[in-house]
Structures are given as C-alpha cells and as structure tokens.
Amino acid sequence: LEQKHIPVITAPAKVKRDETFLVTIEVGKYKAHPNEPGHFIEWIELYSGDTFLFRVSFAGSLSDPKVTIPIKLTHAHGPLKACEKCNLHGLWEGIKDIEVED
C-alpha cells in the first residue's frame, strides 16, 4: 500500500536562496497507483517545513498524480514535505531534506 501512495519528491539537495528550481512530486513512482473513477488521488500539496507552498487538484481518472512546479525559497523552513490524498486510503506524506545556501 505504501509503494502506491507515498508521494516521492525529486528536487536538488541544495539550492540558492531566492533562485528558482524545479520540484517534482509523483504518487505511484515505485508501484502504479490506480487511476480510475472509484480510486484516485484527489490532490498533492507541498510544504517547506510547516510553510504551505502549493496545492494541485486532480480530476479523478482524467489526470496522472504527478506534478512539476518551479519554486524558490528565501531560507530553509525545514525539509520539503509533500502530502497527498487518496479518495479511498486517506492522507500520505513524503519528505526530502533540502539545504538553502546564500
């Protein structure tokens, strides 16, 4: 169940302050998550520590639960934390450490 639901974060280990970089979050990277009308990922959120960065909502079986978004950080609030909601199995979380340099 975990391999289908844990949101996997792909991002650099180190970034420069106020410099844009790409973050990809993918659900089902290790084992495909069903994507059908009765079982799908509703949304993915990204946080830096406890600071909310964005939320992407998905249209049920019409879209894959993967998103790439450019972001920038002013300082390290903590690790990147992705949360996702499966309509059947609830909330799941993935974490990636990141360092913000001057």
Locations of the language-model features?
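Extended low-complexity, serine/threonine- and proline-enriched intrinsically disordered segments
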Residues: 38-52
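Short strand-edge motifs at loop-to-beta-strand transitions and within beta-strands
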Residues: 65-69
